[in-house]
């Protein structure tokens, strides 16, 4: 396995040797029929292993299932190798039943740190969650949301009238962020994309690229009249008043890709699609 650090740098050989055991392969599948069939076939070949005691976990499904698996295994140190048995497979490798062990040993690894969201709801209740793709804020009613944006304690935009706003990681920059006309960020870049969703005022503001070390604070103006929900990947908190977002440096997940099809290569290719 070619092991890469969180910014695409190779890890020292001393750190690679302890991670080379990939004998115990666990399989997890989405509810898609194709994923369930693949699970049955691969477990007949390789056996049934508990994901929490495996050397590597193979996720069968699409990107949604891959994200769920990443959340389950965050900070366990167990590498995840996705094979596409779903509709969207940006984070997945091609599906094949043959030579799986050889593919795993030849795979390249990317380490990803999530964002941590701390949302304070009306009434004072707080809820935290992590996001590998993005944290997004979305209006709950027909009226536009009004949001104040602060970065590292400094107010950068006093009032943004919009349908919402999102903060995306390089991994998530090709997902919802791209659909909202945000920039694609190279994997390994020390950056985050702050992208408005259907901004009404200021109409010409197209977002910002900020350091991944930044602390972003989003305050909801007129929260009673213009309620807003915050979403970290798949977890939603409704009626928020403030949302604090920063990179979670204490947690990470390891993703495996076939040689020549690394996450960095996929992000680069995405920028030349029309």
Regions found by a protein language model. Name each.
Residues 62-65, 86-88, 171-174:
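Short glycine-rich anion-binding loops that position phosphate/pyrophosphate groups of nucleotides
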Residues 2-4, 15-60, 66-75, 95-111, ...:
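ATP/NTP phosphate-donor binding region
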Residues 88-164:
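Catalytic core of DAGKc-family lipid kinases
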Residues 5, 9-11:
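Short, low-complexity intrinsically disordered segments enriched in A/P/G/S/L with frequent Arg
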Residues 77-79:
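Proline-centered loop/turn at the N-terminus of a beta-strand
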Residues 56, 111-115, 131-133, 143-147, ...:
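A generic structural signal for short beta-strands and their flanking turns/coil linkers
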Residues 159-162, 166-203:
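Gly/Ser/Thr-rich active-site loops/lids in small-molecule metabolic enzymes
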Residues 129, 137, 142, 152-157, ...:
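ATP/nucleoside-binding phosphotransfer catalytic cores, i.e., glycine-rich phosphate-binding loops
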